[in-house]
Amino acid sequence: MKSGSARIRLEWKPQKNLSFGLMSSFDRSVQGGYPYAVCDSVTHKPGEVDYNDYSFYKRTLSTTGFSADYQGTGYSINSRTAFQYLSDHQGIDQDFSPRSIYFARQDMKQKMFSEELNIKSTTPGRYKWLFGAFGFWQGIDNTVTLDYFTKDYATRKLYDTPAYGVAFYHQSTIDDLLTRGLSLTFGIRY
């Protein structure tokens, strides 16, 4: 197995009440894989692992996030933005024999973007509030190929799976309700 990763984090505070952050990570992994074998239907014991084609798994993952925070008088505004990229490749000798019969490959690419923005009270009073919004988009492109070597034939299936969503939310809290230390919190999300 060969793998490596790198990470970086930068923070900047141009003013007392304003700060920015950037975080990024990168991971790469390359490995052999999948020691499958035929299982005897009578004894239920696995046979010998016997491949003639190299099975593998390769993954690249990159994640980047950006944050911005502003502290106003009696309130704060926070923003979190993220992007993730995944590239995933698998190859499996699926005939479990020394002959070249079947070989499966799966290639997947995934991209995801998200943003969250909120504003909340920072006053020392009994009442505290928070308003926010969140949104995301994710796209997954998956290709599965099965090679039939004995027939010089291959099947290929393509899957495109987008997903997205938006949410809005609010939370109110009243501290020291009826007695010291008792709080009531109400929240709503759409």
Each PLM stretch: what is its role?
Residues 1-31, 59-66, 115, 121-128, ...:
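Transmembrane beta-barrel wall of Gram-negative outer-membrane proteins
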Residues 19, 23-61, 88-93, 99-108, ...:
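Flexible loop and strand-edge segments within Gram-negative outer membrane beta-barrel domains
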Residues 67-95:
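Membrane-embedded beta-barrel scaffold of Gram-negative outer-membrane proteins
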Residues 78, 98, 119-120, 175:
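Short amphipathic alpha-helical "recognition" segments used for binding
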Residues 110-113:
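Gly/His-enriched, cation/cofactor- and phosphate-binding structural elements
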